[in-house]
């Protein structure tokens, strides 16, 4: 009766959240949010992280999209269940468009904040997200968590 123990969902204490590799190709930009299991047991993630950029009184929330602009992520039918052994990482890609003459958010520099799927702790992962005419202008999107690493 001592069979394998089913993995439990990752909790706040199980995860280290950080910014990962980014790419730039005008006007599309992308960056990864990395989730690393720092716990002592296997856990799972599934779904979309919460992602927002806070600039003064403006908060720009990322829209959840299954497959992004870039077309280089796995074609998904639904968000996968990602199993993380201790020390393993998964990621989600944030994508946005730079200004190409359309109306933009108010110009400023903000903080990217993220919350892992099905958890409650929000973490600031970047202090230099530019919005408005010189930065994130529209179409801020977040893709679901997938296993592995992005862009390396």
Where are these regions (language model features)?
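Short, surface-exposed ligand- or partner-binding patches at beta-edge/loop junctions that are enriched
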Residues: 98-123
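Short Pro-Gly-centered flexible turn/kink motifs
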Residues: 81-95
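Acidic, serine/threonine- and proline-rich intrinsically disordered appendage/tail regions
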Residues: 121-152
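Short, solvent-exposed loop/turn segments enriched in Ser/Thr/Gly
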Residues: 26-32, 106-109
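Asparagine-centered strand-capping/turn motif at beta-strand->loop junctions
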Residues: 33-40
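Low-complexity, acidic Ser/Thr/Pro/Gly-rich terminal tails and inter-domain linkers that flank the onset
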Residues: 1-25
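The feature marks short-to-medium sequence segments in extracytoplasmic or secretory-pathway proteins
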Residues: 46-84
């Amino acid at each position: 009766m001592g069979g394998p123990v089913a993995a439990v969902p990752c909790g706040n204490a199980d995860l280290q959240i950080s910014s990962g590799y980014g790419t730039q190709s005008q006007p599309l930009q992308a960056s990864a949010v990395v989730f690393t299991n720092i716990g002592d047991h296997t856990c799972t993630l599934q779904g979309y992280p919460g992602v927002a950029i806070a600039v003064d009184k403006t908060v720009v929330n990322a829209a959840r999209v299954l497959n992004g602009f870039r077309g280089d992520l796995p074609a998904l039918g639904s968000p996968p269940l990602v199993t993380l052994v201790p020390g393993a990482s998964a990621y989600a890609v944030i994508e946005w468009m730079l200004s190409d003459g359309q109306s933009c958010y108010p110009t400023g520099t903000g903080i990217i904040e993220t919350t892992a799927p099905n958890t409650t702790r929000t973490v600031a992962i970047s202090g230099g997200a530019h919005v408005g005419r010189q930065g994130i202008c529209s179409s801020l999107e977040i893709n679901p968590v997938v296993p592995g690493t992005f862009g390396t």
